[in-house]
Amino acid sequence: MPKDPIRVLVTGAAGQLAYSLIPIIAKGHVFGDDQPVILHLLELPRMMSVLNGVVMELVDGAYPLLQEVIATDEEKTAFTGIDVAFLVGSMPRKPGMDRRDLLTANAKIYQSNGHALDQYAKKSVKIALKLKVSSSDVRNVIIWGNHSSTQLPDVSHAFVNVGGRNVRVADAINDDGYIQGEFLSIVQKRGGAVIAARKLSSAMSAAKAAADHMHDWWHGTPEGHWVSMAVLSDGSYGSPADVMFSYPVYIDSQRQWRIVDGLSMSDFVRQKIQATGKELVEERNEALAFCKE
């Protein structure tokens, strides 16, 4: 029996990240190859002509699962009745800009999105080489904390398939200096490196990450596997409370997440978690101040 379509919103739909994300959704790679979708695409009035071009490409693509496309510059139309939202519309980061420079503009954007989400959307809506192996061979790497240069990539509990055997990543690399130094720096500074090379912020990889993230939320995580997800902090692992903090989480078949508990932690990791948590508290307070102005 055919499934009823779900309504999926993408904000900033004429932007470069959305341009990479929208076809991934339309192809069924996020919600399943038997799940019809109705796309709601939201843009600013001045970008509607560009968005109309995106709609034309979607029509020309003849995606079997795409039942309808609603392109609009009105939040009420965009948010009404949606099941899932990808809130990717924001001021882009440019060369020389720090993430903190974007707080003022983007706090206002997401404040408006939040009001519309609460008022119009369904209440069930979901917001969304070292070892010379494939990334699919690696599992349970953790990203702790903020999406910034203080984020902490942690391989303490990660495993990699090497020659058919599951091996701890830390044992396979066998180089704490690399793990706590070069590897850490590469991940933390990746966004800036992409901007320096492309003169634009990440789009293709960011869209893939958003799609993978929503896929895991929609379908759940396999037994024994976790993913990193920014959720409202409960103070676990010494993180500050009441900020959106990235933790390792399990997701069940009912799309409910829970923070993985009981993980052992080195002093190095604990100190980095405290540092990224401190930054998040500062950014939260700044963003809230902007919203009150």
Regions found by a protein language model. Give the residues of each.
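Eukaryotic N-terminal low-complexity, Ser/Thr- and Lys/Arg-rich leader segments
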Residues: 1-5, 292-293
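N-terminal Rossmann NAD(P)H-binding glycine-rich loop of SDR-like oxidoreductase domains
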Residues: 10-14, 22
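Conserved N-terminal Rossmann-fold NAD(P) cofactor-binding segment
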Residues: 27-82, 97, 285-288
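Redox-cofactor binding/interface segments in oxidoreductases and associated redox assembly factors
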Residues: 85-87
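Conserved NAD(P)H cofactor-binding loop of Rossmann-fold oxidoreductase domains
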Residues: 89-91
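Rossmann-like NAD(P)(H) cofactor-binding subdomain of soluble oxidoreductases
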Residues: 99-130
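C-terminal substrate-binding/catalytic lobe of Rossmann-fold NAD(P)-dependent dehydrogenases
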Residues: 126-293
